[in-house]
Amino acid sequence: MNFINLRNIQKGRTAFMGLAILWVIAFHYSFLQSEISKMGYLGVDIFILLSSFGLCFSLNRNNNYKDFIIRRLKRIIPTWWMLITIMFVINIILQRNHPHSLFQIFTYYSGLGWWFFHNEPFGIYYYEWYIPTLLTFYFFAPFLFRLNIKKLYLLLIASVFCTIYLDYYSIEPRLSLSYQRIPVFIYGVILYKMYTCEVCNKTLKSFLCLSSFAGAILFFVALMCGIGGCAVIVGFMFAMPLFLSLCYKLLYGKLGKVLSFIGTLTLELYLLHIYNLPLVAVMRCVGNRNISIIITTILLIVVSYVVSIVVNKAVEKLNTIGYKGL
C-alpha cells in the first residue's frame, strides 16, 4: 500500500513535468534509438495527468470559471502566439503551407483548425495538436472539478470505452492524439479527489493500488504483444501513480532541482522543439545525431528560459497599462 504516495506526486509535480518533456524530446528526436525513447510520446500523458491534477488545486483556491479561464489563457496564449507567429513567417519564407485568408489565420491562432480543418492544407499540422487539445480540456476542467468521485469514475469508464471504439474503427484517426487523452485528463481529477481524502479513505487507496498494478500489467502486455495505441495509453494512465511514486526517489539533490527548473519551461520547450529546425541546424555543424540532440536540447532550454522572461515581462507591462485581456 505504501508504493503509491499522491502527496509525493504533488510535491514532485514540477520535476516530473521536466522529466516528461525530456522524454518527449527524446521521442521526437529519436535519441539513441532506444526502446525507452520510442515510448517518449507517453510523456504527453504525464503532462496531461499532472496538469489536470494541478488545476484542481487552483480551482480549489478560486473556482470562478471566468477567472480560471483567464489565468490559463494568460499562461499559454502569449507564448503560443509568439512562437507560432515566428513559424508562420518562416513558413512563408520557405514557401511551406501556411494560412492565407483571415478565416484561415483565425482557425490557426484559435486552435479550431486542429479540430475542424485538420485535413485542409491550411489546417494545424499534426505535431501542433497538443495546445489546442490542452485548451479544450481547460474549458471543461471546472465542470469536472465539481463532480464527485463516483460520477468521475463513470465518466472515466465511458470515455475509455468511447476511445477504444473510436480507435478500433479508426474514426478520425488523426484526432486520436487528442481523444485518447480524454480519459487521462479525467483520471487526473480523480487522483486529486483521492488526494484530498487519502488519509481517511482506505478503500479508495486500496483501489488506487490495485488499479495501478493492473494498469502496469496491461501496459507491459500491450507492449510485448505489439498492440500499441489505446491499450498502451490506458494501461500507462492507470499505472502512472505507481510509476511516478517510484520515480520520486530520483528527485533528490541536484537532479531534482534541474528537472524542476526544466519543468517550469515545459510550454516553451514543447513549442520550440516540435519544429525540428534547431536540430537540423545543429546537425549540419556537428554531424553526430545523438551529440546534436544533446546540444540542441541544452540550447532549447536556454532559449525557452529567455522566451519565458520576455513573455512574462510583456504580460506584466500590458497589465500595468491597464490591459485586462489575455
Spans of features found by a protein language model:
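Membrane-cytosol interface segments of multi-pass membrane proteins
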Residues: 1-162, 202-206, 210, 253-255, ...
